[in-house]
Amino acid sequence: MGVSGSKGQKLFVSVLQRLLSERGLHVKESSAIEFYQFLIKVSPWFPEEGGLNLQDWKRVGREMKRYAAEHGTDSIPKQAYPIWLQLREILTEQSDLVLLSAEAKSVTEEELEEGLTGLLSTSSQEKTYGTRGTAYAEIDTEVDKLSEHIYDEPYEEKEKADKNEEKDHVRKIKKVVQRKENSEGKRKEKDSKAFLATDWNDDDLSPEDWDDLEEQAAHYHDDDELILPVKRKVVKKKPQALRRKPLPPVGFAGAMAEAREKGDLTFTFPVVFMGESDEDDTPVWEPLPLKTLKELQSAVRTMGPSAPYTLQVVDMVASQWLTPSDWHQTARATLSPGDYVLWRTEYEEKSKEMVQKAAGKRKGKVSLDMLLGTGQFLSPSSQIKLSKDVLKDVTTNAVLAWRAIPPPGVKKTVLAGLKQGNEESYETFISRLEEAVYRMMPRGEGSDILIKQLAWENANSLCQDLIRPIRKTGTIQDYIRACLDASPAVVQGMAYAAAMRGQKYSTFVKQTYGGGKGGQGAEGPVCFSCGKTGHIRKDCKDEKGSKRAPPGLCPRCKKGYHWKSECKSKFDKDGNPLPPLETNAENSKNL
């Protein structure tokens, strides 16, 4: 732009605000100053060498993009890109008069004269006429606005010289405009005199021709009324905001919209009885407080339908006389779809049980249609006429059904979370498992298969080790018998016994606890002494079985589980030779 320093900054800020205001955009002075400082940082050449033209401005945009790639997008002011884009559009539109004012600081009077020649030379289609005073008034107004916009804030004494210099430059612009206008006026006056000097014969012209001549003469006689064809500001309409499709109504508004679509505008509100009996009392309808419904919905969402506070809110709602339709609408509006299905199912079951119990016990019969709101009591207007006793039964069933809704997550993990504790006996675990399964499904083959599968999967690690050998062949009774005395010591002892007999652990457990044979092997019980089947240890007649096992390692060789008298090793565990083993006869001689 040919100007640097504080003067260049003020001029750039004023021109920037002027250009953007013509497009209906308002930029704060602080944002404009921040953009100018960033512009100097990115393109140091711009204040001295650049100008407000499309080529230089595109170069600035490329350097801004390069700066963002090197330093990151966070280093660029948030208003930099929008301002650059708006100025690029203005420069593309070639707004000559505004750009001439922006470049006025570095243009001489002769250059201004050349630049204004194109604006002052008008064709016959572009000429506009009026009073000369009006023309100058419009020019003065535009120039004064520019001066006031630039010098609308007080400055220090050291900046007064810059201010006077800029005002002188504005006066130069006005002087060039006036000179071009005077030259144009003289040329028009010469043409007008030549036109008037022409000898016209009045008799040779028709009235239509006279009208045309008068119109043309009026144009030429109005030289004093020539105005400068100043380009008016083009005020662009702001784009209309995008109209988003409104969201569907929810809650009571959604119910109202659905009722309007179906044509059912009959409202059912809580019934209020003012008297003591149905004979001397007329029901009065009042709306359920919206605050109560919001409180109930909030409690269900935040704490769950089975929380104590939620149940208190339900009891508060139940203190009024609600019809079946009221309860269904309240449950549907506050509960989740899954919980609403559970509530409705439980409500129907409670209503059926109440009808069966009330059969023959009341003078006025209570039908299932009254409690469910079906049949002849389907419409809300018919439910309003129900007696107090029926409405009381409806409320009781609705509250009981609400309390039957399980807590969140319990219904999904009730069986998966039923596991045997580390210190819990296996028979107690089986009892809890059967109770939970039979609550969910009736007794039968399917429930037995599920219990057997969970009895293995949800057992603790100790019982699983005991059950594993007979998992596929045993029954629930075999599982219980195998885990009857389950403890770590029992498992370790069984492992030692299997190792001493040279059997696998699984084979030993099968022989001991059976595989679906009532706790015995295929050939009867197994003797722990001789390892044979058909008898137990106390009935074993084998002499070898009566010999007592050694308590530990051999004291002679230290590397075998046998008695010292039976040791046949010639070397001990360290490889040292051992003396010959003394017999009982040699020991007696030494004595």
Swiss-Prot record:
Listed PROSITE patterns: ZF_CCHC
Region entry Disordered, spans: 151-191, 568-591
Q: Where is this motif: PTAP/PSAP motif?
A: 305-308
Entry GO terms, CC: viral nucleocapsid
List, in alphabetical order, the GO biological process terms annotated in this UniProt record. viral budding via host ESCRT complex; viral translational frameshifting
Instruction: Return one GO MF term.
Output: zinc ion binding
User: Is this entry keyworded Protein biosynthesis?
Assistant: no
Stored Pfam families: Gag_p10, Gag_p24, Gag_p24_C, zf-CCHC, zf-CCHC_5
Q: Which UniProt keywords apply?
A: Capsid protein, DNA-binding, Host-virus interaction, Lipoprotein, Metal-binding, Myristate, Nucleotide-binding, Phosphoprotein, Repeat, Viral budding, Viral budding via the host ESCRT complexes, Viral matrix protein, Viral nucleoprotein, Viral release from host cell, Virion, Zinc, Zinc-finger
Start-end of Basic and acidic residues biased regions: 151-169, 178-191
Domain of life, source organism: Viruses
Residues that span the membrane, as ranges: none
Q: Which InterPro entries match?
A: B_retro_matrix (IPR003322), B_retro_matrix_sf (IPR038124), Gag_p24_C (IPR045345), Primate_lentivir_Gag_pol-like (IPR050195), Retrov_capsid_C (IPR008916), Retrov_capsid_N (IPR008919), Retrovr_matrix (IPR010999), Znf_CCHC (IPR001878)
Q: According to the Swiss-Prot or TrEMBL entry, at which residues is a lipid covalently attached (N-myristoyl glycine)? A: 2
Site (Cleavage) residue list: 99-100, 195-196, 228-229, 254-255, 269-270, 496-497
Q: Where are zinc fingers of the kind CCHC-type found along the chain?
A: 525-542, 552-569
Q: Which PANTHER family match?
A: ENDOGENOUS RETROVIRUS GROUP K MEMBER 24 GAG POLYPROTEIN-RELATED, IGE-BINDING PROTEIN
The protein here is known as Gag polyprotein
| Provenance organism | Mouse mammary tumor virus (strain BR6) (MMTV)
